[in-house]
Design a protein with these regions (language model features):
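Hydrophobic core segments of alpha-helical transmembrane domains in multi-pass membrane transport
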Residues: 17-18, 42-46, 72, 105-109, ...
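Single transmembrane alpha-helix segments in multi-pass membrane proteins
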Residues: 3-56, 68, 73-94, 241-248
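Membrane-interface helix caps of multi-pass small-molecule transporters
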Residues: 22-26, 47, 51, 77-89, ...
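Transmembrane alpha-helical segments in multi-pass inner-membrane proteins
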Residues: 208, 222-266
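Alpha-helical transmembrane segments and their helix-start/interface "positive-inside/aromatic belt" motifs
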Residues: 88-102, 194-197, 202
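Helix-loop-helix "hairpin" substructures at the membrane interface of multi-pass membrane proteins
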Residues: 146-224, 254
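Transmembrane helix-bundle core of multi-pass membrane transporters
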Residues: 104-168, 228
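Interfacial loop-to-helix junctions that mark the boundaries of transmembrane helices
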Residues: 1-6, 58-65, 141-152
Length: 266
């Protein structure tokens, strides 16, 4: 059961990163900065935790919630920076993405190793993010398999399914795909290409950033070096997983488990 739990935790991180990258790529952008975005998500969570703890807060659920809010904020900011550079200034997407990945890894490691931010294992603060459904113990093996996981796992599943529905079943999704596949035609049809690309990149970054904080929540033996390597690897695996799942968010759920299984076995 411990092996399966490890797979679920890794799959959660990958699923957030993959879903975020799919949204970005649907708008016509290959964001190689996903590892950096995940680093900023993790860093933002640590910042939120420290601010709340330094203010004397001791409510475990509030600590976790604030950490997630800060992770979203940091990820959105770095996503906006990437959007500005690649959409408005038209800089090379690959170079910009790699620069953000390098910058994110450096900021994360420097902030934690220098002692500016003391990142504590967030999972210790709230059982709600380790076991979203406390009643799972009464369901035996069925409960252990399906209901014994942290809330972020279920959030990742919901986000992936919702993304698939929005992309394929709504006017917004149709416009977004049009922007990515043929921006000139989309612009001629009256679709604001710049706005859609900005929104897709920022929203995708926010979702990917949750993958960074998910790793921190689920890390049983947290250290700066191990987290640095794990988050970086998860970011690149997420980008590869987008191609493996053929840019389909719902299929990425299965793909995340496959990649997680192989990663855990390795």
């Amino acid at each position: 059961m411990l092996f399966f739990t490890s797979i679920v935790k890794q799959a959660t991180v990958l699923l957030f990163g993959t879903t975020g990258e799919i949204i970005t790529e649907k708008a016509g952008h290959l964001n190689l900065g996903i590892p950096g975005v995940m680093f900023f998500g993790a860093l933002g969570g640590c910042v939120g935790l420290n601010i709340y703890a330094n203010c004397g807060g001791n409510n475990s659920f509030a600590i976790v919630l604030i950490a997630i809010i800060f992770a979203i904020l940091f990820s959105a900011i770095i996503g906006a920076v990437y959007s500005f550079l690649t959409v408005s200034l038209r800089s090379n997407q690959n170079i910009t993405g790699l620069a953000i990945s390098t910058f994110g890894a450096g900021c994360y490691k420097f902030s934690l190793q220098s002692g500016i931010i003391n990142c504590i294992k967030l999972s210790a603060y709230s059982d709600a993010f380790q076991h979203a459904f406390p009643f799972y113990t009464s369901l035996g093996g069925f409960g252990d398999i399906f209901f014994s996981h942290g809330a972020l796992f279920y959030i990742a599943i919901i986000v992936a399914v919702a993304t698939g529905l929005i992309l394929n079943k709504t006017r917004t999704g149709l416009f977004l795909r049009a922007v990515g596949e043929n921006p000139a035609t989309a612009d001629a049809a009256g679709i604001n290409v710049t706005t859609y690309r900005y929104l897709a990149t920022i929203i995708g970054s926010v979702i990917a950033g949750l993958g960074g904080i998910a790793y921190i929540f689920y890390s049983s033996n947290f250290s700066v070096d191990s987290a640095n390597a794990a988050v970086d690897a998860s970011g690149w695996l997420s980008i590869a997983l987008v191609i493996f799942t053929m840019w389909k968010p719902t299929l990425s759920i299965l793909g995340a488990f496959v990649f997680s299984l192989l990663s855990t076995m390795g």
